[in-house]
């Protein structure tokens, strides 16, 4: 905060926040823990530049080939799916719209989710806690439309049954090549405030806001480059061997950050681009700000309008505490819905009955995924359920400890030597074997130091919400409870057991059986 207030360009926190798009402000200025000598509360945690939004790109030549107006992008979802239908022709290697696949394909689904009026996560304004929130009817409507784009059954001109009008590809490189080769009619891509599509040929490619959904607006992702200073900076020696205090390192970091986010840096960038003959690729904002208005004639006004509308309607990616994995958790219900379609269990058709039943099924899938996300990603479990899980975890921990002690006791008994004459256990017999014990001391100390000490000190992670940076919190048996009630963990155990059985059966028993057969079978 003090750096912002002392900066000649910002001068105050309010002035700094006013310089940012409205959607970016809550990300950089929010509640946080006490760090770096600052009290817990609202602080500026980062400074951002290079604002990015996602917009809809379309190929004008493909639109024209499909009988669509090359200058008329889809304005709503009805037009979007109609355009995708008319463009899609797999026999000619043409696809209506590009959609991401893979383990985090829901990243591409977010635009549909937001445009339907739903959200992936929301924050409680009173408590500040984040919750998954995609188990709503609006989210089901978004998923239904997304599924239609990806799986709707239709026949191409050759009479072949096709599914969907999209690519659903997780390979970014192949998607990029398909864009360049003119195989994709529509796709979403980033627009930056520094170039704003300036590297795209406006005669071939159009840029528009994402089509409006049931909410009446088309909402896409807003992103930005955010720079912050590590709170745990400590003094250290530089490359010349001189000690540099932590405060001086922070000052140097801020000097770099403030310059990279300053008007001076933007001016240098604009001048350099113009001098290199790249003035046409600069955004209208930069061209006006630094007086290169002669290049504005090369820039379609609709592109700037698309950027501004996306900035107004868009939302930042989920940024709350523990929300980093939301795309993985949100992809799971999408995959479940896809599998239901493949299995023929998802009602098809546009009749009110089929659509209502389909939406009910999709919402049920999303609601289960929402509860799963809150429990596993956010860590929010109802107190009664948490108490039950903790009780089970304590019982299991006691059983494990008892079994461990029993096994160790029996191993100790087996390896404890007995006198061959009396049958009694022998003692340590230090007087007789002192030299042997002395020789063993270095080895024992080494084993204790490098094996058992790390194991004992590291085992405290079992009882902690461990943080690499910051304070780790003691959570008792909550970690064990989380594992015991995790479907993924039990699935991993089952898969490990199956792999072991296959390995033993095929790799160990099969050769033995084969050898016996070869030996016993008469020739």
Model regions and ranges:
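Long, aromatic- and glycine/proline-rich binding clefts that accommodate carbohydrate-like moieties
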Residues: 29, 208, 270-339
């Amino acid at each position: 905060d003090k750096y912002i207030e002392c900066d000649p360009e910002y001068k105050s926190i309010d002035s700094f926040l006013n310089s940012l798009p409205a959607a970016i402000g809550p990300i950089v200025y929010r509640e946080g823990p006490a760090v770096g000598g600052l009290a817990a509360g609202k602080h500026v945690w980062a400074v951002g530049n290079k604002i990015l939004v996602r917009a809809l790109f379309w190929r004008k030549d493909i639109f024209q080939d499909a009988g669509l107006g090359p200058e008329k992008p889809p304005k709503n979802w009805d037009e979007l799916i109609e355009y995708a239908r008319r463009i899609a022709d797999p026999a000619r290697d043409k696809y209506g719209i590009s959609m991401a696949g893979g383990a985090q394909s829901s990243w591409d689904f977010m635009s549909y989710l937001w445009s339907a009026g739903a959200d992936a996560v929301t924050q409680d304004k009173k408590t500040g806690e984040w919750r998954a929130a995609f188990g709503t009817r609006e989210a089901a409507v978004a998923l239904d439309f997304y599924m239609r784009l990806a799986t709707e059954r239709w026949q191409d001109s050759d009479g072949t049954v096709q599914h969907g009008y999209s690519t659903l590809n997780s390979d970014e490189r192949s998607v990029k090549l398909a864009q360049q080769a003119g195989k994709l009619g529509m796709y979403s891509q980033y627009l930056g405030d520094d170039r704003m599509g300036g590297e795209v040929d406006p005669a071939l490619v159009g840029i528009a806001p994402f089509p409006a959904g049931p909410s009446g607006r088309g909402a896409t992702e807003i992103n930005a480059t955010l720079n912050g200073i590590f709170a745990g900076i400590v003094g250290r020696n530089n490359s010349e061997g001189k000690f540099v205090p932590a405060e001086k390192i922070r000052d140097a970091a801020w000097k770099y950050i403030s310059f990279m986010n300053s008007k001076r840096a933007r001016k240098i960038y604009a001048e350099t681009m113009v001098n290199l003959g790249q003035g046409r690729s600069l955004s209208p904002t930069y061209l006006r700000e630094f007086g290169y208005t002669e290049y504005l004639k090369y820039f379609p006004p609709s592109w700037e309008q698309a950027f501004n509308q996306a900035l107004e309607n868009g939302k930042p990616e989920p940024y709350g505490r523990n929300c980093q994995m939301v795309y993985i958790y949100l992809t799971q219900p999408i995959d479940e819905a896809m599998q239901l379609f493949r299995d023929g269990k998802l009602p098809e058709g546009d009749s009110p009955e089929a659509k209502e039943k389909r939406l009910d099924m999709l919402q049920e899938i999303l609601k289960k995924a929402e509860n799963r996300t809150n429990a596993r990603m956010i860590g929010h479990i109802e107190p009664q359920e948490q108490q039950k899980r903790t009780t089970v975890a304590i019982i299991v921990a006691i059983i494990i400890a008892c079994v461990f002690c029993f096994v160790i006791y029996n191993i100790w008994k087996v390896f404890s030597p007995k006198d061959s004459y009396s049958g009694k256990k022998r003692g340590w017999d230090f007087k007789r074997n002192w030299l042997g014990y002395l020789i063993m001391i270095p080895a024992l100390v080494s084993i204790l130091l490098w094996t058992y000490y790390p194991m004992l000190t590291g085992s405290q992670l079992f009882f902690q919400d461990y943080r690499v940076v910051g304070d780790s919190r003691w959570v008792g048996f909550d970690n064990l409870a989380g594992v015991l009630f995790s479907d993924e963990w039990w699935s991993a155990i089952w898969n490990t057991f199956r792999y072991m059985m296959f390995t033993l059966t095929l790799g160990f028993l099969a050769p033995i059986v084969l050898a016996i057969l070869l030996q016993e079978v008469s020739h």
